[in-house]
Amino acid sequence: MELGLSWIFLLAILKGVQCEVQLVESGGGLVQPGRSLRLSCAASGFTFDDYAMHWVRQAPGKGLEWVSGISWNSGSIGYADSVKGRFTISRDNAKNSLYLQMNSLRAEDTALYYCAKD
């Protein structure tokens, strides 16, 4: 009986680790106004192409602001008015990755950028 409980406990731990959602952003930096940056987000722990994905940001001292979103198959894409025409969201389902190409950067784009799943 004691051995059986140990195995159940071990399986529960392994299942929890396997299902842990991880979203790891990269590509940020310090650039002059007018320049470009490309952000990447590597996803794991879930079936990436089952979900719409989003970029949100938080400027210093402010709340979260939605920046852009993309459907699972890239068929539907949306942007906040503040970035429309300058930012481009894309995804590569084969690589479980989300991207944000940011052009013509402005001082007001200074923020922490996060990717998020639906």
Swiss-Prot record:
Disulfide bonds join 41-115. The keyword Amino-acid biosynthesis does not apply. It is found in: Secreted; Cell membrane. Residues 53-69 are annotated as: Framework-2. Keywords: Adaptive immunity, Cell membrane, Disulfide bond, Immunity, Immunoglobulin, Immunoglobulin domain, Membrane, Secreted, Signal. V region of the variable domain of immunoglobulin heavy chains that participates in the antigen recognition. Immunoglobulins, also known as antibodies, are membrane-bound or secreted glycoproteins produced by B lymphocytes. In the recognition phase of humoral immunity, the membrane-bound immunoglobulins serve as receptors which, upon binding of a specific antigen, trigger the clonal expansion and differentiation of B lymphocytes into immunoglobulins-secreting plasma cells. The keyword Translocase does not apply. Immunoglobulins are composed of two identical heavy chains and two identical light chains; disulfide-linked. Pfam families: V-set. Residues 78-115 are annotated as: Framework-3. GO terms for biological process: immune response; immunoglobulin mediated immune response. Residues 70-77 are annotated as: Complementarity-determining-2. GO terms for molecular function: antigen binding. Residues 20-44 are annotated as: Framework-1. Residues 45-52 are annotated as: Complementarity-determining-1. Residues 1-19 form the signal peptide. Residues 20-118 form the Ig-like domain. Residues 116-118 are annotated as: Complementarity-determining-3. This is Immunoglobulin heavy variable 3-9. GO terms for cellular component: extracellular exosome; extracellular region; immunoglobulin complex; plasma membrane. Its main location: secreted.
